[in-house]
Amino acid sequence: MRLPSVGAGVPRRGSAAVRAFGRALLALMRWRVEGDVPDLKKFVIAVAPHTSNWDFVVGMAVMFALDLKLTFIGKHTLFRGPFAPILRWMGGVPVDRSSSHGLVGEAVRGFESVDQRVLAIAPEGTRRSVERFRSGFVHIARGARVPVLLASLDYAARCVRFGPLIEPGSDVEAEVRRIEAFFSTVRGKNARG
């Protein structure tokens, strides 16, 4: 299985066993990965469409196979019980979505506090059907002065595609519309409607 190149500056997990596990999982699920991960120490990955819990499994398989050390934001209720330490080890950060106040600032401070960080976010903010992507991920990227890498989960082709790297401009709504257009033809696991 050919995997994309990953730049030397990108945060890595550094485990051959985890890398082998991720590659085996991708092969077992018959998924492939296209595109390249830029050689940057800090960026946001916008992953869409997010329509199923299987998206997490596919995303983790890619993260492990490429030896990426990612941070991701998850619903705080997922971080309870026996899975909490595992999710944190994987890079999970719990958030209370009912209180979005301060989330952008907290994420920006997270970027400022470290030398390397890749933050993966589902722009929809949920698995439910939404009319528009939320704009928080663009605000985070602008506040942290980092680009956004687009990554699609194409279930029709069983392919994760790393797409363009976007430097967000000052018109956040225009950026969100441009990013939505990139994902508009990608079919998630569950149809949106």
Predicted regions and their residues:
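Soluble catalytic domains of membrane acyltransferases
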Residues: 6-11, 27-185, 190-193
